[in-house]
């Protein structure tokens, strides 16, 4: 298992989810990805995407204007 970070600050919906999907496709099951964003839509969009694709949201935090969503990649990394 390794940890990775994806910076989507400044991107608006749907780009944070698209970039998350692209990055997850390069990771292995068990890897952790922290997505950092400024678009408040990620609070709903990334957890919804994770549910559909079988990944786990581990933590969601807010730091000033930034939102961080940590997820664990499960199953096939092609999702």
Where are the model-predicted features located?
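Core SAM-dependent methyltransferase catalytic element
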Residues: 68-77
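Amphipathic, hydrophobic secondary-structure cores in small proteins
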Residues: 8-61
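Right-handed parallel beta-helix/beta-solenoid
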Residues: 1-7
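Residue-level signal for secondary-structure boundary sites
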Residues: 43, 77-79
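A generic structural signal for beta-strand entry/edge sites
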Residues: 3, 64-68
